[in-house]
Regions:
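Hydrophobic, well-ordered beta-alpha structural blocks that scaffold small-molecule cofactor pockets
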Residues: 1-124
Length: 124
């Protein structure tokens, strides 16, 4: 399974779980960009233990180990951080079928304008 582009995202998957891997600034920008495309993510995943268990943009942040409990067929993971080289093998090893790069969805927007719209209350 290769890393997919946002253009490969199946809008029929809206009934499925959409999660964002990375709860930092890029993750928050991705969450806003998805919402502007009519896609609501359910939660964030982050490997930083200081973020886990907290909320950002009214969404819970879980650990990668917690993500393993999700339905690997119907969970769509948007990778919104710089650690592709470790996240992609983790997702493959745990049999996730649907994971995406976020660069092309962010290109659709003025990132500086999006940045001013995200919830910056939770800084790490």
């Amino acid at each position: 399974m290769l890393l997919k582009n946002f253009s490969d995202f199946d809008y029929k998957a809206l009934n499925n779980k959409v999660v964002i891997f990375g709860a930092g600034t890029i993750g928050r920008l991705t969450d806003l960009a998805l919402r502007k495309n009519g896609i609501e993510s359910q939660l964030f995943v982050d490997s930083d233990p200081r973020k886990q268990g907290k909320e950002v943009q009214n969404k819970k942040i879980i650990s990668p180990d917690d993500l393993k409990r999700y339905d690997t067929e119907n969970t769509h993971v948007f990778i919104a951080c710089n650690y592709f080289s470790s996240i992609v093998p983790f997702l493959k090893k745990n049999k996730f079928k649907n994971f995406y790069k976020v660069t092309d969805i962010l290109k659709k927007f003025d990132v500086y304008k999006l940045y001013n719209e995200i919830d910056m209350d939770m800084l790490f």
